[in-house]
Every structure is written in C-alpha cells, then in structure tokens.
Amino acid sequence: PCDWSSDVCSSDLVSIGMVGTSLSGVTFVSVPGMVRSIDMTYMQTVLGFFFGYILIAKVLLPLYYKLQLTSIYSYLDDRIGQHSYKTGASFFLLSKIVGAAARLYLVVLILQHYVFAYWNISFAVTVVISIFLVWLYTYRGGIKTIIWTDTLQALCLVAMLIVIIWQVKDKMQLDFAGMVQTLQASQHFRIFEFGDWHSTQHFMKQFFSGIFITIVMTGLDQDMMQKNLSCKSLKDAQKNMYTYGFAFTPVNFLFLSLGVLLLTLASQQQ
C-alpha cells in the first residue's frame, strides 16, 4: 500500500485515511444531533460534497500535479506572490495548531483523569509524553505514517458507528427490517426540501454550499491534499478522490440514521 522508501502510497489507502481525517469524536455528537432540528436534510449538503470532490479531481489535482507541488500554497507564490503564499500558509498553520491543540487537550484530559492520575503522574508529564509520541511517529514515518494512522482511525470510527446503531436497534427490540421501517416511518426521515425557497434547508442552497465547502475545506487544504499528492500518479490521486467522495456519503447517512433512531428511542422512553 505504501512505498516506505519514498512518499508514495496507494490511492485506496489514501482515500480511507481521508475519511478518518474528516471524522472525529465530535462527529458522533454533531451530525446525529442535527436531525432534531433539520431532520436528514444535511444529506443534501453531503451530495454537494460528492460533486465538489469531482471538481477537485478534475480541476485542482491536474493543476497540482502539473506544477509538481509538495505544498499547495506554493501555487499562490507562483501566481500572486510571496506575501499571498506566506499569508495562506500562516492561516493554515494557525487553524491546524488551534484545532489540533483543542483535540489533543481533550484526549490528554481523558487519559489523565482515567489512567495516569492513578499512577500519580502529573498532567504536565502526560502532555509532554503525548506530544513526544505524536512527534516521534510523524518524524520517523512522515506522510506514510500519517496516512496509516488516519486509515486505522477511519476503520475504528466507522466500526464503532455500526456497533452503536446495532446497540440502539437491540435496545428498541427491532430486527434489521424493523429498524429500516422505523427509519422510514419517522417524521425526521426527510432528506430533500424543494418547496420553501426561503428555508435555509432548501436543496439548491445546501447542495451548492456542499460543493464550495468541499473545494475550500479539502481542495485548498494542505492537510487533505498532501495525502492526494502522495499517490503514484494523477490518475491514482483522482481515483482516490472519487473513492473518498463515494465512501463519505453512506457514512454520513449512517450518522444521520443514528440520530433518527436515537430520537425515536428517546420518545419511546418518555
């Protein structure tokens, strides 16, 4: 899957790893939680994501490979100038540092509370150890290690999503067919909104928002695109983008379905 003598990885591995990058523990709360207020209309945005990935594969990836970029922000240097390059790269670093720090803080806090506190290890030591481990595996393995860990994260998150849905199904005393019928019968099983143009959930608004969100958050994001640039060729990178977009759609559908099932379970227990 990965050539460890270089920065080259297979497109299938990269696409799974990108799913892992897009998902997190926050996804388990935020996406199912949307169902209560907007039903399953978020799927309209997800469909826009898919077409956004196609545009990235057809427009941005050929450009990046043609210029043989290792950093997508160097394109700003070529087209606009050094100041735009530094500005784009600086905002990327700032956003990633803040986001990574918040996630790391949450993980370290949990480890400290449930594990290291019993060994009388201070919080500062836990932080230093965690940062050192992150630095060690990225420094020794580079982009290949990042892709492998993202892939493992994706598999674990999707597996846990399926397990949670199955546990909720059993809690509701349903078989698989009964679960599907429950989803279809729910008032929250509303995916498309075509009637009210003034609604923020109107299909056209959500669909095109999804396209532009994908272009900005994936196509112009170094963290995501460096994984595509690790593929052997442009064709492999495009295949990865198509696979990633295709896989991301059913995963979001499962998260929204979980939200419907949880709302149904909550109403039954009131």
Where are these regions (language model features)?
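Helix-loop-helix module between adjacent transmembrane segments
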Residues: 19-20, 43-139, 209-214
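Hydrophobic, membrane-embedded alpha-helices of multi-pass small-molecule transporters
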Residues: 9, 13-29, 130, 141, ...
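Short amphipathic alpha-helical coupling elements at transmembrane boundaries
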Residues: 74-82, 89, 145, 181, ...
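Membrane-embedded alpha-helical core segments of multi-pass
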Residues: 27, 52-59, 68-69, 129, ...
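Hydrophobic alpha-helical segments and their helix-loop junctions in multi-pass secondary transporters
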Residues: 97-104, 108-125, 139, 152-192, ...
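Small-residue-rich segments of transmembrane alpha-helices in multi-pass membrane proteins
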Residues: 13-18, 79-88, 153-166
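Transmembrane helix-boundary motif of multi-pass solute transporters/channels
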Residues: 12-48, 109
